[in-house]
């Protein structure tokens, strides 16, 4: 999914219906890995949205946040859904603000379900952003700093309203993690493709493997080894679904010298062979 925000902005607001009109047939149901943030905020109707191979419901009061680097796919039944979309670049928000910190959390929740008490304020925030964006397109001159700043603040309000809603833990996020577990998680994000052993992470963090294991099990009920294997398998699945790379270069890029060892690992982690997983993703993209 490609996105270039209209100059001079790093944000775009549209409806799902408008996106469907712009996209060629079959484009939206194919796996995409955007380098920008995508918020999908349901207005009425029901549909599902796939993010990193999990389906999330979208309806009135439900929102989905796709973060840069995640693989996402629109469902074939999204014509039943009316929704607002907000697309924005990772560096658009004001640094040092709460909204920017929320957006920068790559482990943040995917789905949000707003209660009646918070839905009104969320609806107001997204309506105001939509109107502000339309006004900016009509009236702003290239390089208009005031309009850009206004859109940054309107988007910040929307994010704060959205994240005030409870986020189910079932989406696999570990939002708000700190301490040793949080530092391990960040280091894992940096090194998972080159370091598969727990000892590497414990050494870099300055702790014993046992101490690191206690920290992760307390935080998320997983061992460091389980977290390492899950992260490698997720990246492999993303590349198999979205890229055209053959299995061998994917394996090499993830630190496997032997493609057969990678295939064994992926099958053990996911229950399906890499080539079969790729075929399934391609077939699901073309199903009506």
Identify the function of each model-found stretch.
Residues 105-157, 161, 186:
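Amphipathic alpha-helical segments enriched in hydrophobic/aromatic residues interleaved with Lys/Arg
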Residues 70-93, 99-100:
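Ligand-binding loop in jelly-roll beta-barrel domains
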Residues 1-59:
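Generic protein-terminus/edge-of-domain signal
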Residues 218-259, 279-288:
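Terminal helix-turn-helix DNA-binding modules in bacterial transcription factors
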Residues 216-223, 265-279:
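A secondary-structure capping/hinge motif
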Residues 61, 212-213, 261-262, 266:
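Short hydrophobic/aromatic patch on the recognition helix
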Residues 120, 142-151, 160-205, 218, ...:
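Short, Lys/Arg-enriched, Trp-marked, Pro/Gly-tolerant hinge/linker segments that flank
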Residues 199, 210, 246-249, 259-260, ...:
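Residues within helix-turn-helix
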